[in-house]
């Protein structure tokens, strides 16, 4: 059975006009390596830690500014939200299609809330806590191309033509602000698009981005702004001692107009100055150590890296299944070809390397979790190939071969062919990222030993489910297994309304 909404009644949760206050008993374990009777052994000690959560229930008017607004992802997301808001339908070769938010975790997935008369009861994910309605988002942003969003949508060739015709009147007046352009960080083939750029030194560029954010917020009368990078993949920045390794060195490098500070880092820096959430949707190392230090010091939310939408999402499920089943993946070969501007930019070796790193590290935590299958330091052979084929456009093809060792020296091979409609998969993920980032800023918590409430750590691990290479605070384990990431996100939101984690034990029927 599916229900639209619910309210929790419990001694551990209290609803007021302004907030939801919950008390949550976090059950975990403590491991001790100790000497007992002359030999060392591991001891696992269950423990319970009490947390309190406060969630502000006042949903703000939200503005979303996209870096690369005129790209395929930006035009697809903007058009998709307009289509939903206006209730647009259009003819395809198969049927009359209604606008929807399929592919969005927050808008189109469900959670189990219990059982009733022997039947499982589910509710929308978005019913857990008050969230921004995507139809109410105000969009803006920057692009190095001055093409309006209607023409950008036509250039992208993602939407059906009938839908494009209906969206055009809404999108013709949407023109991106000039963006930061540094040809050293992206492929040379992007130069022909760069007719809308911010001039000046890096310090002046940061100041202009800050000015743009403030003017957007004032003009549109929004309460909050989230900024997200969905522009070209950049090459990796060199981490240099004395340049970007500390907060002080990074800020000094911007003052000196050092060439190795990337555009994405400059956007993030501007957002941190304004205490506005910044999310990196591409694989480059935007968050150099000095930038992370600054975000932590100023308690400004940052998240990333790289949207997890197609091939990598499948990989984080399949390898988790294989290793969890006691099967040993020994070779993973991933081949992609695509024909959109992302593919053209990735045809340059230096930008492809950023994507290769992002895609290759996704199985690390799953491999290291099983010392029966893998010796220390052992890892599957893992190869990632991306080729640019203009004809296929946004319809990316992903082909994977997984070779594994099975019982008694046998070999098992799984081959997948995945046609990933690149921007149609990425757009709802962008939506989830900005909605969850905004929600995160309204949640505070404290442990039983803490005197006052505080926000989540500014390095937003809560967004990990949506990213290929999750950004985590220093010293925090990286989790890539998709099921664990979703469980973490759902269970944190459940804790905010006093609900226990979903453990699937269903003891009442045993």
From Swiss-Prot:
Name the EC number(s): 5.5.1.4
Query: Does this UniProt record's set of keywords contain Isomerase?
Result: yes
Residues bound to NAD(+): 70-73, 143, 180, 190, 193, 230-233, 281-282, 306, 309, 340-342, 355, 393-394, 422-423
| Pfam families named in the record | Inos-1-P_synth, NAD_binding_5
Q: Pathway, per UniProt?
A: Polyol metabolism; myo-inositol biosynthesis; myo-inositol from D-glucose 6-phosphate: step 1/2
Cellular component (GO) terms are: cytosol; nucleus
Which reaction equation describes what this protein catalyses?
Answer: D-glucose 6-phosphate = 1D-myo-inositol 3-phosphate
Give the protein's cofactors: NAD(+)
The record's section on InterPro entries has: Myo-inos-1-P_Synthase, Myo-inos-1-P_Synthase_GAPDH, NAD(P)-bd_dom_sf
User: Its induction, per UniProt?
Assistant: Induced by sodium chloride, copper sulfate and poly(ethylene glycol) 6000.
Is the Nucleus keyword given for this protein?
yes
Quote the function comment for this protein.
Key enzyme in myo-inositol biosynthesis pathway that catalyzes the conversion of glucose 6-phosphate to 1-myo-inositol 1-phosphate in a NAD-dependent manner. May play a role in oxidative stress resistance and influences ascorbate levels.
Q: Which family does it belong to?
A: Belongs to the myo-inositol 1-phosphate synthase family.
Task: Identify the PANTHER family for this entry.
Answer: MYO-INOSITOL-1 PHOSPHATE SYNTHASE
Q: What is this protein called?
A: Inositol-3-phosphate synthase 1
Identify the species of origin.
Populus euphratica (Euphrates poplar)
Gene symbol here is IPS1
């Amino acid at each position: 059975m599916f229900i639209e909404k619910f309210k929790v009644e419990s001694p551990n949760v209290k609803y007021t006009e302004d907030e939801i206050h919950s008390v949550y008993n976090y059950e975990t374990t403590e491991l001790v390596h100790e000497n007992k009777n002359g030999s060392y052994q591991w001891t696992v000690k269950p423990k319970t830690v009490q947390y309190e959560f406060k969630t502000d229930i006042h949903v703000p008017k939200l503005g979303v500014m996209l870096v690369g607004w005129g790209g395929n992802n930006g035009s697809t997301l903007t058009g998709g939200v307009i289509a939903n808001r206006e209730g647009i339908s259009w003819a395809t070769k198969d049927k009359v299609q209604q606008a929807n938010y399929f592919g969005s975790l927050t808008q189109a997935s469900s959670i189990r809330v219990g059982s009733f008369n022997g039947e499982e009861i589910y509710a929308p994910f978005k019913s857990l806590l008050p969230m921004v309605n995507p139809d109410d988002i105000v969009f803006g942003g920057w692009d190095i191309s001055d093409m309006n969003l209607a023409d950008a949508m036509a250039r992208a060739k993602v939407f059906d033509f009938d839908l494009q015709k209906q969206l055009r009147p809404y999108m013709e007046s949407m023109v991106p602000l000039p963006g930061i352009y540094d040809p050293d960080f992206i492929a040379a083939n992007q130069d022909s698009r760069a007719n809308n750029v911010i001039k000046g030194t890096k310090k002046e560029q940061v100041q202009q981005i800050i000015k743009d954010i403030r003017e957007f917020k004032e003009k549109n009368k929004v309460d909050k702004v989230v900024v997200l990078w969905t522009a070209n993949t950049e090459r990796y920045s060199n981490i240099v001692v004395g340049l970007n390794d500390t907060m002080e060195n990074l800020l000094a490098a911007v003052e000196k107009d050092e060439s190795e500070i990337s555009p994405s880092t400059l956007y993030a820096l501007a957002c941190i100055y304004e205490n506005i959430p910044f999310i990196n949707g591409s694989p480059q190392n935007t968050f150099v150590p000095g930038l992370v230090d600054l975000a932590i010091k100023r308690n400004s939310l940052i998240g990333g890296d790289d949207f997890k939408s197609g091939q990598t999402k499948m990989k984080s499920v399949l390898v988790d299944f294989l290793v969890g089943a006691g099967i040993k993946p020994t070779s993973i070969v991933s081949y992609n070809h695509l024909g959109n501007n992302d593919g053209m930019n990735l045809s340059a070796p230096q930008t492809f390397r950023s994507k290769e790193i992002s895609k290759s590290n996704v199985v690390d935590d799953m491999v290291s979790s099983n010392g029966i299958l893998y010796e220390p330091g052992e890892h599957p052979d893992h190869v990632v190939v991306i080729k640019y084929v203009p004809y296929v456009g946004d319809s990316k093809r992903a082909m994977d071969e997984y070779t594994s060792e099975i019982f008694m020296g046998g070999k098992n091979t799984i081959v997948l062919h995945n046609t990933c409609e690149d921007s149609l998969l990425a757009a709802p993920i962008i939506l989830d990222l900005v909605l969850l980032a905004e929600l995160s800023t309204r949640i505070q918590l404290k442990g039983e030993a803490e005197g006052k409430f505080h926000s989540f750590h500014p390095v937003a691990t809560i967004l990990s489910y949506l990213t290929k290479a999750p950004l985590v605070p220093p010293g925090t384990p990286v989790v890539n297994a998709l099921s664990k990431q979703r469980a973490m996100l759902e269970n944190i939101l459940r804790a905010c309304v006093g609900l226990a984690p979903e453990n699937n034990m269903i003891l009442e029927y045993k």
